[in-house]
Amino acid sequence: MILHAQAKHGKPGLPWLVFLHGFSGDCHEWQEVGEAFADYSRLYVDLPGHGGSATISVDGFDDVTDLLCKTLVSYNILNFWLVGYSLGGRVAMMAACQELAGLCGVVVEGGHPGLQNAEQRAERQRSDRQWAQRFRTEPLTAVFADWYQQPVFTSLNDDQRRELVALRSNNNGTTLAAMLEATSLAVQPDLRANLSARTFAFYYLCGERDSKFRALAAELAAECHVIPRAGHNAHRENPAGVIASLAQILRF
């Protein structure tokens, strides 16, 4: 079994750019950014429970990494960058810490490196279970209306919230809930030490209005790019800023 993905081919000899979306997104999420890099072959992946991979279920990050690796093999991708937002960034960091063959580097936008104590994990598990129950039982428009009121999304205006609620409500609530629980921050290990000891290039993107993840970025041994005029979802709020940072990263 492999994950559903959309492949766009560029010039031979360059590494692939493998894009991983955030929770409740899909393979279209990164395409505005990715299509600015037409020289590179691009793979836009649907993570389990989402888009064309909605029927694929996993028990945890190990399953996601295994599926991602099998997907890369199926496309004969031998050299690649992982580019991930939020959940996709966490998947990218988890996979990269497994020393993937052919990995050139990782670019994470607003991805959490992991909670650092049992109390934080227990609180996050309670919260994610409550959200999962709502995704399973309530209309998605109502759930996402509340989801986008969370503090991390304070930079969004009312029109942006309404647009995201309408877009994300096309998902399957049951499969979203399953993925939320399987890849909860509560079950993700703290990756700070692994990332510090890494052998791959590591870059971190965060919006200038995303104070939480700017603080987290400062804890990581990564080159940080602050995206102007953007909050947590920087590639949506300022795609040109993210394109500029990614172009700078890929020039090295």
UniProtKB/Swiss-Prot annotation:
Pfam family, one: Abhydrolase_6
E.C. no: 4.2.99.20
Record's keyword terms, sorted: Lyase, Menaquinone biosynthesis
Lineage top rank: taxon: Bacteria
A molecular function GO annotation: 2-succinyl-6-hydroxy-2,4-cyclohexadiene-1-carboxylate synthase activity
Enzyme's top EC category: lyase
Metabolic or biological pathway: Quinol/quinone metabolism; 1,4-dihydroxy-2-naphthoate biosynthesis; 1,4-dihydroxy-2-naphthoate from chorismate: step 3/7; Quinol/quinone metabolism; menaquinone biosynthesis
Catalyzed reactions per annotation: 5-enolpyruvoyl-6-hydroxy-2-succinyl-cyclohex-3-ene-1-carboxylate = (1R,6R)-6-hydroxy-2-succinyl-cyclohexa-2,4-diene-1-carboxylate + pyruvate
InterPro entries with a match to the protein in the record: AB_hydrolase_1, AB_hydrolase_fold, SHCHC_synthase_MenH
Gene Ontology biological process terms, A to Z: menaquinone biosynthetic process
Disulfide bonds: none
Secretion signal span: none
TM ranges: none
Entry function: Catalyzes a proton abstraction reaction that results in 2,5-elimination of pyruvate from 2-succinyl-5-enolpyruvyl-6-hydroxy-3-cyclohexene-1-carboxylate (SEPHCHC) and the formation of 2-succinyl-6-hydroxy-2,4-cyclohexadiene-1-carboxylate (SHCHC).
Family statement drawn from the similarity comment of this UniProt entry: Belongs to the AB hydrolase superfamily. MenH family.
Assembly and binders: Monomer.
Protein name as it appears in the record: 2-succinyl-6-hydroxy-2,4-cyclohexadiene-1-carboxylate synthase
Annotated source species: Escherichia coli O17:K52:H18 (strain UMN026 / ExPEC)
